Amino acid sequence: MKQFGFTRLMRLVDPGDFKQIFAAGERVSSKAFTVLYHSNSLEYPRLGMAIPRKHFSRAVDRNRIKRLVRESFRQRQQVLGGRDLVVLSKPGINRHPNSDLLRCLERQWIGLVKQCSDS
C-alpha cells in the first residue's frame, strides 16, 4: 500500500460499520467538525464522512468539504493507527476558508491521538 495513498480499503463503505461507530464510538468535537472514532482490528485507519445536504444546498460545497477531509486524513493516516473514523460536518462551515478548516481538522487529529493515548 502506498505510504500516503487513499485506497478503497481505507474508506468506510459498509452501513454496518457506520452503525457500530455511531453506537459505540467516542467523539472529538470542534467548531466545524465532530469526529467519531472506534478502534478496528486492522493496522490502518478507515474514513467515513457524513456531510448532510441540509447543511450545504449546493453539491460543490459538499464536495469541497469532502475533498478537504480526505486530504487531511490522507496526510495524517500514519499517526491515526487502526481506527475507524466518521467525520460529521456542522452547519455554517462553508463560510470558512479552506485553510481554517484544514487547521481545524489537524487539531482534531492531534486531539484524537492524544485522547486515545490517555485512555
UniProtKB/Swiss-Prot annotation:
GO terms for biological process: tRNA 5'-leader removal. The lineage of its organism: Bacteria, Pseudomonadati, Pseudomonadota, Gammaproteobacteria, Chromatiales. This is Ribonuclease P protein component. Keywords: Endonuclease, Hydrolase, Nuclease, RNA-binding, tRNA processing. Belongs to the RnpA family. InterPro entries: Ribosomal_Su5_D2-typ_SF, Ribsml_uS5_D2-typ_fold_subgr, RNase_P, RNase_P_CS. SUPFAM superfamilies: Ribosomal protein S5 domain 2-like. It catalyses: Endonucleolytic cleavage of RNA, removing 5'-extranucleotides from tRNA precursor. Signal peptide: none annotated. One of its GO terms (molecular function) is ribonuclease P activity. It is an enzyme of class 3 (hydrolase). RNaseP catalyzes the removal of the 5'-leader sequence from pre-tRNA to produce the mature 5'-terminus. It can also cleave other RNA substrates such as 4.5S RNA. The protein component plays an auxiliary but essential role in vivo by binding to the 5'-leader sequence and broadening the substrate specificity of the ribozyme. Pfam families: Ribonuclease_P. It comes from the Bacteria. GO terms for cellular component: ribonuclease P complex. Consists of a catalytic RNA component (M1 or rnpB) and a protein subunit. The keyword Mitochondrion does not apply. Its EC number is 3.1.26.5.
